[in-house]
Amino acid sequence: NGEQDYQWRTWLNSIRPLSANVPLATTLGNHEMYTLDWKMREPYAYLNYFAVPPNGNEIFNRRYYSYDFGDVHYVVLDTMLYESNHEDNHDTHHPDLYDVEVQWLRQDLAANTKKWTVVLMHRDPFRYAFDRPGASRDVGFDDEGVLFMPIFDEFNVDLVLSAHLHTYRNRGHVRNFDRDPSGPLYILTGIAGDARRPKWKQHPLDVYVAPQPETNNYMSMTVTPNKLIVKSF
């Protein structure tokens, strides 16, 4: 919950051994936009806690951004259009969030000169069908996938890491919404905490699904002159 102080303290204390030595590059998620009574608002606490790079936009400053580290260009997206415009959000609504962000993203990727490009986004671009009685949702691609994936194809993004569904899925390389070894590698990152969501059917593009019931897991990435090596534990 984005305004629950004890949750922030607990999480920040738990990562202190890491954050004391390694800079954090955070990605905005939906819970960072929740109030104490589970309404929605601007992510004020999140923006106050993390000094990520500016993006040049006064309204959406630091909600999405990019940075270079070694041979990798990292792009961190804001996928909170739904929360930014929800009827329970009593702050200023932002129906133009994705329009503004896409313009920035295209300019950012066009100027990129690094060997590797990695995108991080909270909402997963793939749409999974519910695996529970009485619930129905078509499998395919979410609105964020329909919008952003063609841009990732156009600028030859190498790796896309997403979250939100509390499960690990490796979809392999995808281009033009289909299996293609020349496309970006799409990995849905798994569970770092105790919130289990074992309610998703397998997607036709899944190449690996974590064993269920899923346990806590994390990922590492190693950059070599010729490879990006991603491992999940």
Q: Which ranges hold each PLM region?
A:
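General beta-strand recognition
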Residues: H73, I229-K231
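Short active-site segment of divalent metal-dependent hydrolases/proteases
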Residues: E32, P125, T167
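A conserved, positively charged/aromatic
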Residues: F152
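Extended active-site neighborhood of metal-dependent phosphoesterases/phosphodiesterases
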Residues: D5-T113, G134-D142, L147-F148, L159, ...
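Transmembrane beta-strands of outer-membrane beta-barrel proteins
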Residues: D78, K231-F233
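Short acidic, glycine-rich surface-loop motifs adjacent to enzyme active sites
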Residues: N1, N112-F130
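Metal-dependent active-site segment of extracytoplasmic phospho-/sulfohydrolases and closely related
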Residues: L120, V157-R169
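Active-site glycine-centered loops adjacent to acidic/histidine catalytic or metal-binding residues
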Residues: N1, G29-N30, H122, A163-H164
